[in-house]
Regions:
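Macromolecular interaction modules
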Residues: 1-104
Length: 104
């Protein structure tokens, strides 16, 4: 199942970022992105060596690469991307497209 992975850098103000992420952005992802099958998000706590280069990671799952591309190109997808850029005050988020390996 293809997924979009979004990595948010540490923001200028962690409290404001986390509040806006939970109260505005996460609901927007679920409500406005068509074809979304599953949404997972996590706060990054650090690395074994200390501080992490990211504050938060999100995974958005779709049935196919085509449905992922259609979702991001949609009006709801574009609004959600714009909002992600707005709240990511530590720099633009890193966006990756991936697919989970099949279990061995």
């Amino acid at each position: 199942m293809p997924k979009l992975i979004v990595l948010y850098p540490p923001p200028a103000d962690v409290t404001t970022f986390e509040r806006r992420y939970h109260s505005e952005h996460a609901p927007m992802v679920v409500q406005k992105i068509p074809g979304l099958k599953k949404f997972r998000a996590a706060q990054v706590l650090g690395t074994p060596a200390g501080a992490a280069p990211y504050q938060r990671v999100a995974e958005l799952y779709f049935d196919s690469i085509e449905s992922l591309q259609t979702a991001i190109a949609s009006a709801g997808g574009q609004a959600t991307v714009a909002h992600a850029m707005e709240i990511s005050t530590g720099g633009p988020p890193v966006v990756l497209i991936a697919e989970d390996d099949k279990p061995v």
